[in-house]
């Protein structure tokens, strides 16, 4: 009985060691994959269309602001038959960004007063 118990503890120790080695390998693979995704994201971010610039070539290329992504909005000017598309913030999100900026400024003032 002691032999079975000792053998079981030995197998359990061996199994936990081998599984921890496998988990370390998986963690390293996840980190490498995450780094490659971040590099791709940085490369993609350089090609975005700034706010109020023409986005008719790619309607999904508008840049991201601090909080939200701009949307490609198309319209017809008063004197013209050609459709014009520009990257613009949606009205409700623009108001939310302004409110967030004011809240940050107010928070900075409070921190300055009490901090």
Curated annotation (Swiss-Prot):
InterPro entries in the record:
Spider_toxin_CSTX_Knottin_CS
GO molecular-function term, one example from the UniProt record: toxin activity
Q: What is this protein called?
A: U3-lycotoxin-Ls1s
- Entry's localization field: Secreted
GO CC, any one term? extracellular region
Q: What is the lineage of its organism?
A: Eukaryota, Metazoa, Ecdysozoa, Arthropoda, Chelicerata
Q: Which family does it belong to?
A: Belongs to the neurotoxin 19 (CSTX) family. 01 subfamily.
Disulfide-linked positions: 48-63, 55-72, 62-87, 74-85
Q: Which organism is it from?
A: Lycosa singoriensis (Wolf spider)
Q: What is known of its domains?
A: The presence of a 'disulfide through disulfide knot' structurally defines this protein as a knottin.
Q: Where is the signal peptide?
A: 1-20
